[in-house]
């Protein structure tokens, strides 16, 4: 009996130790390897409806313009380092937001960030300078983007942690800004810092 009780206790202990604790949102975490993972939750209302000129003529895009959103946590990190290598940067719509009707069928894409010295043909060399940045949009005519390059519709820029972006969410016919409503987004950034300031 005593052995059975001890093994039961051990089993409970192991189960409890396997509990995963999630970090709260809106936090920048820094590892010892010189990489930063940043996540922030924001919300936005759609500003206008744009026809999608492409394979499906009845498809429409909803424009979410949240340019000028500030990230104080990222700003403090950038003030301590001269540059970052951008591993990934973009936004995901939060699924099943009760305020965002049809969120489960909305797709979100994001454009990359480039340093002024980099070229669009070298996507592996992305640098955010702490004193400014430059956006290299894949398509200047955002109102009618080609269907063959759907993952390059947005502009994202960072200048002292002010990151603005233009987000398109594609959906089927009958879509309207009123139907979509107020949507939540998860903005994410995986950065590798370099050039620590003295």
Swiss-Prot record:
The keyword Transferase does not apply. Residues 1-13 have a biased composition (Basic residues). Keywords: Capsid protein, T=1 icosahedral capsid protein, Virion. It comes from the Viruses. It is found in: Virion. GO terms for cellular component: T=1 icosahedral viral capsid. The keyword Repeat does not apply. Its main location: virion. Residues 1-32 are annotated as: Disordered. Capsid protein self-assembles to form a bacilliform icosahedral capsid with a T=1 symmetry, about 50 nm length and 20 nm large. This is Capsid protein. It comes from Mushroom bacilliform virus (isolate Australia/AUS LF-1).
């Amino acid at each position: 009996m005593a052995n059975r009780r001890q093994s039961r206790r051990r089993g409970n202990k192991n189960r409890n130790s396997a509990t995963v604790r999630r970090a709260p949102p809106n936090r920048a975490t820094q590892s010892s390897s010189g990489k930063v993972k940043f996540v922030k939750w924001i919300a936005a209302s759609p500003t206008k409806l744009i026809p999608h000129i492409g394979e499906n003529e009845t498809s429409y895009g909803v424009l979410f313009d949240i340019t000028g959103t500030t990230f104080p946590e990222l700003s403090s990190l950038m003030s301590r380092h001269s540059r970052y290598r951008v591993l990934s940067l973009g936004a995901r719509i939060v699924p099943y937001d009760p305020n965002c009707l049809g969120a489960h069928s909305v797709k979100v894409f994001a454009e990359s960030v480039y340093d002024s010295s980099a070229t669009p043909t070298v996507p592996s060399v992305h640098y955010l300078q702490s004193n400014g940045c430059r956006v290299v949009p894949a398509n200047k005519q955002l109102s009618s983007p080609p269907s063959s390059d759907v993952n390059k519709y947005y502009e994202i820029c960072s200048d002292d942690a002010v990151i603005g972006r233009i987000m398109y969410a594609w959906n089927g016919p009958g879509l309207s800004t009123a139907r979509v409503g107020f949507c939540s987004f998860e903005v994410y950034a995986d950065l590798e810092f370099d050039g620590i300031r003295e």
